Amino acid sequence: ILVKLIVHKNKAVYHYQSVRNTQTDFPVLTCAAAKRADGAYRFIIGARPGRAVLFEASAETIQALVEEKQKAETKADADTRENKDKAQIEKKAVCLATWVRDQVQTSSNMRGSAEYRKHLTGVLIKRAVRVLEDR
C-alpha cells in the first residue's frame, strides 16, 4: 500500500511540442524541454518509435558548445545589445539542436522516416530553446 508520495519541486520552465500528420493522429515526434534555474537543459524526445529518450545538457556543456561554434565563426558584428542577445539565443538553439540531433536514434514506420524524424528533432529543439529563453 502506498502511504506517502513526495514530489520535490524544481525551479524550471517547461515546454512541450508534438508534430502530427493530422490533428487527431498519433504524433510523428514529440519534444518536452525544461530549463532549470541553474541554466541546464533537459530534452525528452518521444514517439520516435521506441521509448522516449532523455538528453541533459549542463550550463557548462552549453557554454562549451556555443564557444566551439563561435570559434568556427570569425565574424565580428557591431550590433545593438538586443540583436546580440537574440544572436546568442539563436546560437544556443542551433548548438543544442545539433547536439541532440546527432545523438538521437530514430527509425522509420508508416508515420515518418528516420531522416525526417532526425530533422524534426533539430527543429523542435530549436523552437523549444527559443521559447524557454524568452520566458
Where are these regions (language model features)?
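C-terminal structural segment of proteins
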Residues: I1-R135
